[in-house]
Amino acid sequence: MLQKIGDDHKFPINKFGEIAKYLINQKVVKNFYNPIACSFKTLNRAHSENYINNIKNKTLDKSGIKKIGFPLVDSVVQRSLIATGGTVLASKLALNYGVACNTAGGSHHANYNEGAGYCVF
């Protein structure tokens, strides 16, 4: 069973769906693409092998989890991998079509060995 963060969590997770709806309603977008999870090889270009494994295996220490701000549960790990995959996909689409964005992107607080501010990768 996929563990999820609760609806009572202070991070506004629904904002990503709302952004997509707004772009559709305003006729800003023509296409949406479904990203796949970012590969270990790609993640390892920006993050340490140890940190990636601690996230994937959910073995990050309590202080690291606290810095991120999310519980380290299956849904957070999957969402983080897919959101990062979305940024990779958006960059490829932008190179092909001139413009693209990741509506679940924008998290930019993680560094090589740790996450922070609701940003895992």
Label for each model-derived stretch:
Residues 1-121:
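HDAC/HDAC-like amidohydrolase catalytic core signature
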